[in-house]
Amino acid sequence: MTDNSKIRVVVGMSGGVDSSVTALLLKEQGYDVIGVFMKNWDDTDEFGVCTATEDYKDVAAVADQIGIPYYSVNFEKEYWDRVFEYFLAEYRAGRTPNPDVMCNKEIKFKAFLDYAMTLGADYVATGHYAQVKRDENGTVHMLRGADNGKDQTYFLSQLSQEQLQKTLFPLGHLQKSEVREIAERAGLATAKKKDSTGICFIGEKNFKQFLSQYLPAQKGRMMTIDGRDMGEHAGLMYYTIGQRGGLGIGGQHGGDNQPWFVVGKDLSQNILYVGQGFYHEALMSNSLDASVIHFTREMPEEFTFECTAKFRYRQPDSHVTVHVRGDKAEVVFAEPQRAITPGQAVVFYDGKECLGGGMIDMAYKNGQPCQYI
């Protein structure tokens, strides 16, 4: 059996069951394990469901049970500067950001990794459902988690080779149900704790109310593509492409009784465009432009390749051709795609391997920009 006792692994512990089991498994495998709780958001003046104080108590309880030292580190400034400012800027620009992708890139695998190194870490570990595999040349490949429903490589797609070289994902080969079983068998304090949802580190707050604290909403006109007035919208930032609920128009104004969806935004005129039907023609596109293109291992500056891609989390893969030009790419779809949303991540896969991805700038239909922004 390998002696891991001289290998120090610093585990990012959130107070949830996944990171608790991550720490437990590493301890059982003989590693020198340290737990670290990251405080990334000041919730003292908020009425959120999730509180950092309760989570830290859970981290302390689990660390004591496992028998590992634990620390708390405050990344509120880093989170605000590197993630939250970006999040607000994207909404201001009419896009729908994915803060979890940026949070992993900038906080969990940058600020936290840097902090772990000061504790003498050889590796960091998190409770993400993903896998890392080292090839004969020492290159680390990031693979999907074995639990298809929980795979989180979409959110980890901006990680660099340097970050992956220093990362362990002990849950990657497990199903979520197995993780719960391990926690219950070990009697961990977090075994029955429900999974967190909501924005990375901000918790389950009322999103509309939360956003309005930071960005003043500007009401405006709601219209169909052909110019029919449909009433008033509450502020473009509250709507995302392809959204159905929250429009306040129900089945009215249409002869065919199909539901209404957000099909576009005009930021300069502050107009929200809506249309009837899940597959409304304005929602369909056959290519996209992306920026911040990044690969998890070394790739040429300019090249073209075929692969599969996801345009949002928990979406089946779609076949695409990718034309890479530096940190930008054109992604052409084999089949038309619905509701490609600027600000979201496009993530590339080769079978089980996550190759990387970028941020969606604009969708196109037969070379013409979709009426999104």
Curated annotation (Swiss-Prot):
Q: Which domain of life is it from?
A: Bacteria
List locations, semicolon-separated.
Cytoplasm
**Residue numbers binding ATP:** 12-19, 38, 127
Name the Enzyme Commission number(s) assigned to this protein. 2.8.1.13
Segments carrying the region annotation (Interaction with tRNA) are 150-152, 312-313
**Keywords in alphabetical order:** ATP-binding, Cytoplasm, Disulfide bond, Nucleotide-binding, RNA-binding, Transferase, tRNA processing, tRNA-binding
MF terms (GO), sorted A to Z: ATP binding; tRNA binding; tRNA-uridine 2-sulfurtransferase activity
Catalytic residues? 103 (nucleophile), 200 (cysteine persulfide intermediate)
Renumbered to this chain, region (Interaction with target base in tRNA) spans 98-100
Which Cys residues form disulphide pairs?
103-200
Q: Where is this site: Interaction with tRNA?
A: 128, 344
Q: Which reaction does it catalyse?
A: S-sulfanyl-L-cysteinyl-[protein] + uridine(34) in tRNA + AH2 + ATP = 2-thiouridine(34) in tRNA + L-cysteinyl-[protein] + A + AMP + diphosphate + H(+)
A GO CC term?
cytoplasm
One GO term under biological process is: tRNA wobble position uridine thiolation
One Pfam family, short name: tRNA_Me_trans_C
- Signal peptide range equals none
| UniProt similarity note | Belongs to the MnmA/TRMU family.
Q: What does this protein do?
A: Catalyzes the 2-thiolation of uridine at the wobble position (U34) of tRNA, leading to the formation of s(2)U34.
- What PANTHER family does this protein map onto? MITOCHONDRIAL TRNA-SPECIFIC 2-THIOURIDYLASE 1 (PTHR11933:SF5), TRNA 5-METHYLAMINOMETHYL-2-THIOURIDYLATE -METHYLTRANSFERASE (PTHR11933)
Q: What is this protein called?
A: tRNA-specific 2-thiouridylase MnmA
Organism, as annotated: Streptococcus pyogenes serotype M12 (strain MGAS2096)
From which lineage does this chain's organism come? Answer: Bacteria, Bacillati, Bacillota, Bacilli, Lactobacillales
